Amino acid sequence: MRKNLWTFQFGGEASGLVGSAMVSQHFVVLLMSLYCLTQSVVESSSWWSLGMNPVQMPEVYIIGAQPLCSQLSGLSQGQKKLCQLYQDHMQFIGDGAKTGIKECQYQFRHRRWNCSTVDNTSVFGRVMQIGSRETAFTYAISAAGVVNAVSRACREGELSTCGCSRAARPKDLPRDWLWGGCGDNLDYGYRFAKEFVDAREREKIHQKGSYESSRIMMNLHNNEAGRRAVSTLADVACKCHGVSGSCSLKTCWLQLADFRKVGDHLKEKYDSAGAMKLNTRGKLVQVNNKFNSPTMNDLVYIDPSPDYCVHNESTGSLGTQGRLCNKTSEGMDGCELMCCGRGYDQFKTVQTERCHCKFHWCCYVKCKKCTEVVDQFACK
């Protein structure tokens, strides 16, 4: 019956066999295309999505919590296993991702690429499939966010496997100052972030010397740079004790820096990021040997940045059409650079602000609301 069907469609037994082979070939191609598409979706999904859809707790951890980890989008197999072992950590990984995303958007708010998110589990879209310096920054700031969130959660007693910092007393701390209190557990936060964030890269298997292997090395390097930024900027904080605030005695502990400082630090590293390439041994080396080799504290990239001026679905660029710009600025936020020479439209908006604020005894400030019509400019 099947033979007759093909004969009917292709006009004869011989042509039927050829037709069957052709259809089979097309079917295989279709399956391969679907497989590649599925793999692309899997590869593009990321644990960053935990920052977009916060993990609910505590009820999800009560009984049979393993399904939770399989339901969380963007996790690799290794990350799902860590989720099953450390389920109470997942909320703070999400917090760290969210902190990293927000800081990325703040640091690039005046740039053509402004760290915009998209409505899927890749979070940043196809632009992250390019090994650019923007991708390097994103990996670093998100890894830093996890260190920050987990270290702080330890200090606040939110996690069952860690507590206050046990960091050694700094050698330069004055003798009469006490080393104690409850510091941020940077050591634990660093180690857990390394285990979790790097898991996705370490479980990938690609041929040595391939582009994919260079991306893995790039991602791991920038993850480490992000973690080290948090570690480098952490400092000693102290509290005074004594009669009438005389500060005759101080208690000190290790404290994380404000995350804005981490963002500023990594933004500087972004501006000076090193362009890399694969050598014959399958290692990343500098493209230009005239510069100092990047350290583990620096960011590295392997691809030039795409054109962020125009919308391009293949690269993930959203373009700058409709972006607000500063008419009087000569910087990246200025209309000339932001709009890529396309010009801009002017429009008026009404802004409401607090004004004429007065302090009243005791103890509050009362303000009026003032409205103002202002000119704004948006790229064509």
From Swiss-Prot:
GO biological-process terms attached to the record: anterior/posterior axis specification, embryo; canonical Wnt signaling pathway; cell fate commitment; cell migration involved in gastrulation; dorsal/ventral axis specification; negative regulation of canonical Wnt signaling pathway; neuron differentiation; positive regulation of transcription by RNA polymerase II
Keyword field contains ATP-binding: no
Post-translational modification: Palmitoleoylation is required for efficient binding to frizzled receptors. Depalmitoleoylation leads to Wnt signaling pathway inhibition.
Lipidation (O-palmitoleoyl serine): 244
Presence of the UniProt keyword Secreted in the record: yes
Gene: wnt5a
Protein name: Protein Wnt-5a
Entry superkingdom: Eukaryota
UniProt lineage: Eukaryota, Metazoa, Chordata, Craniata, Vertebrata
Function (record text): Ligand for members of the frizzled family of seven transmembrane receptors. Can activate or inhibit canonical Wnt signaling, depending on receptor context. Plays a role in normal embryonic development.
Short name of one Pfam family: wnt
Matching InterPro entries: Wnt (IPR005817), Wnt_C (IPR043158), Wnt_CS (IPR018161)
